[in-house]
């Protein structure tokens, strides 16, 4: 039996400034994932530090916070069968040089000097997805609606 999950995706500054928002969203929709919440925001340092809390003691933490707060980002909640795992596979390896062609990071990720511009953040577990979604979205900002097949064939218009 399939398990419907929700996961958080952040389209990061390097993707925003390169005009990749539509391409990235399109890939998720074509895969059959449903967008149940989405907005463009400018993440402040406080929110960024909460989001990346697990990296606080790592040497790249300050650079990561500087990077994610540099421009607006698009945050979205995707829903679907095994959404966390599906999105992680679509994203590819964290480091773009290790990401397979055909994945989002493999196709669009860059390494510029010492910086890794890996295009998107994707929750790494159901537990982190729940925590991250609650950081960026209020419950009333997430929507339930039928997909086309349900709308046209099962429930009617």
Curated annotation (Swiss-Prot):
Keywords: ATP-binding, Cytoplasm, Kinase, Magnesium, Metal-binding, Nucleotide metabolism, Nucleotide-binding, Phosphoprotein, Transferase. One of its GO terms (molecular function) is metal ion binding. Its EC number is 2.7.4.6. InterPro entries: NDK-like_dom (IPR034907), NDK-like_dom_sf (IPR036850), Nucleoside_diP_kinase (IPR001564), Nucleoside_diP_kinase_AS (IPR023005). One of its GO terms (cellular component) is cytoplasm. Pfam families: NDK (PF00334). The keyword DNA-binding does not apply. It is an enzyme of class 2 (transferase). Its main location: cytoplasm. The keyword Methyltransferase does not apply. Its cofactor is Mg(2+). The active site is at 121 (pros-phosphohistidine intermediate). Gene3D superfamilies: Nucleoside diphosphate kinase-like domain. One of its GO terms (biological process) is UTP biosynthetic process. Transmembrane segments: none annotated. Belongs to the NDK family. Major role in the synthesis of nucleoside triphosphates other than ATP. The ATP gamma phosphate is transferred to the NDP beta phosphate via a ping-pong mechanism, using a phosphorylated active-site intermediate. This is Nucleoside diphosphate kinase. It comes from Pyrococcus horikoshii (strain ATCC 700860 / DSM 12428 / JCM 9974 / NBRC 100139 / OT-3).
